[in-house]
């Protein structure tokens, strides 16, 4: 399972800055589309081929009035699910009483804690860290979140115990499908409907938890693994069942999956939580199918309203198939696997370099790149750079000056001509290096001697 790293610390020590610095180290797999909502409290990141989830508890809050309420309930959920805790302190302010209280509170979690002394740029690191030795945390790191100093070595050390991510080696043939959605949208009902219709033998896979259950099954001689992120149900004081929604477990399921099935509730429309989940999936680059549940029984005007809202708010995810279903009664459920298979095969498809290069030439001839300083941007050739999502690498000159609008044009044209369905496409641009860049025009010794002879000859003629 992908590791989870939690950031904790008192306000204004730089948790959000470090979060942004770490999550920004991995380029987004797709363009930053207008209208795409991202939850900045949780994020995917990668360092040296090791993926992880990072949680910023800064937005969750720390109460510095009473020790008993030092951490909110949501903070404690995040810390309970974390594999590693990064405890941030301010190297310029020194040790405070709140820092001591937080350190005391962290001990009860029985987790690996790294003390991260931030804002040490321009300071002697040993002196900056010395003030915090009394906290009793052995792993101490000095960093500068704003300038990036020390972050690479910090990530290298905390990720060392975790293995490099290799999806291909974990499961050979089965298509992993993550069912993502808000509590009570019908994820478990849909999975039960699928399993009931197919009459398959279901067994629990080793290592599954109550929060995320993996269910393998076979349909039409194809193997699948359904990852249910429904969550833990607990009883409240008034004896009502309430579903505990874990963002972290959902993020882990999304990262493990080949295809994500986002379930929406037709009765409630598209909520902010739906948009946040969609943002996670888009950023992960996974293949996507959207299912609108509880479609049966709606009035026609309500259906039209939902379709209009989907078209307006999900325009940046127009690569995904949308299917209207009823998990309870089964209508539309059978067609989901057609969409899932299409999305999966599009995400893992391979294309030869000659084919991609010819397509690039045709696309750029149809709409030529703009000129920069009187010189036209040249797109020379393209090749495949990865799968799930498919990555196309384009080589050429002056690619740094290529406008975003032209990049979107290339993306849309490649998707259309390659017939990609249900998967985003990432395009990387690599410019050719000028071998004479930053080189001074230095004369050879022979040229120097010739120049001197000419100068002597010119003087003798005066």
Curated annotation (Swiss-Prot):
InterPro entries cross-referenced by the UniProt entry: G_ENGA, GTP-bd, GTPase_Der, KH_dom-like, KH_dom-like_a/b, P-loop_NTPase, Small_GTP-bd
In the UniProt record, the signal sequence range is none
Could you list this entry's UniProt keywords, alphabetically sorted. Answer: GTP-binding, Nucleotide-binding, Repeat, Ribosome biogenesis
Family assignment from sequence similarity: Belongs to the TRAFAC class TrmE-Era-EngA-EngB-Septin-like GTPase superfamily. EngA (Der) GTPase family.
PANTHER family from the UniProt entry: GTPASE DER
This chain's function reads: GTPase that plays an essential role in the late steps of ribosome biogenesis.
Q: What is this protein called?
A: GTPase Der
Q: Which organism is it from?
A: Legionella pneumophila subsp. pneumophila (strain Philadelphia 1 / ATCC 33152 / DSM 7513)
